């Protein structure tokens, strides 16, 4: 096990993490870009700082992650997976920054998939709906039992990795089976 700390918004830190990983483990076969945060509010209320924080973390961080691992993934014919959101195709009031970032992640990942599959690199994006996490200060509890659980996304990733190499699920939408009880 190798634990590293890096800010996804800092390309140099991403590159340093890749070098440390390759030095310790030898190669990089799988990359999962899963950093994300949300700043919500109407376009009138969202600040420049809030906007930049969301875009730099959720979208630019995904770009930096792929860019810094690309040569490694080419060598191993690896797999690059992004965790986007259903907010990457479904907009909502108060979601200007978050929607823009997740629409961007979805589009970026799909375009990268077209660019990289000719190199033998598989690229997929998983677009979950409501997931029981600590996102934006939420404390998972019984009230979140109806939501997708973190381990469900983990199982989905494992399923992707087990698929026959000739098959590429490029964009996967996943949502809770049942809506919340009112």
Q: Positions of the model-derived regions?
A:
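The beta1-alpha1 cofactor-binding region of Rossmann-like NAD(H)/NADP(H)-dependent oxidoreductases
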Residues: 5-16, 48
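Active-site loop immediately N-terminal to the catalytic Tyr-X3-Lys motif
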Residues: 44, 92-96
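C-terminal helical subdomain
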Residues: 125-126, 133, 142-182
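Active-site-adjacent segment of SDR/Rossmann-fold oxidoreductases
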Residues: 90, 111-121
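Substrate-binding pocket helix/loop in short-chain dehydrogenase/reductase
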Residues: 42-43, 50-52
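Active-site helix of classical SDR
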Residues: 66, 101
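Residue(s) in the substrate-gating loop at a strand-loop-helix junction
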Residues: 85
């Amino acid at each position: 096990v190798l634990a590293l700390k890096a800010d996804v918004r800092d390309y140099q830190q991403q590159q340093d993490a890749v070098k440390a990983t390759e030095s310790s483990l030898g190669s990089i076969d799988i990359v999962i870009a899963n950093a994300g945060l949300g700043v919500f509010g109407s376009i009138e209320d969202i600040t420049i700082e809030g906007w930049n924080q969301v875009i730099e973390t959720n979208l630019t961080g995904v770009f930096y992650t792929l860019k810094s691992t690309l040569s490694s993934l080419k060598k191993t014919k690896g797999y690059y997976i992004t965790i986007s959101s259903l907010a990457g195709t479904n907009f909502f009031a108060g979601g200007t920054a978050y929607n823009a970032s997740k629409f961007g992640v979805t589009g970026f990942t799909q375009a990268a998939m077209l660019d990289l599959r000719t190199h033998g690199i598989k690229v997929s994006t998983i677009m979950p709906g409501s997931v029981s996490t600590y996102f934006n200060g939420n404390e998972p509890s019984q009230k979140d039992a109806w939501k997708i659980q973190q381990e469900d996304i983990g199982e989905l990733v494992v399923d992707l990795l087990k698929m026959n190499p000739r098959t590429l699920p490029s964009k996967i939408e996943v949502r809770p089976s049942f809506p919340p009880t009112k």
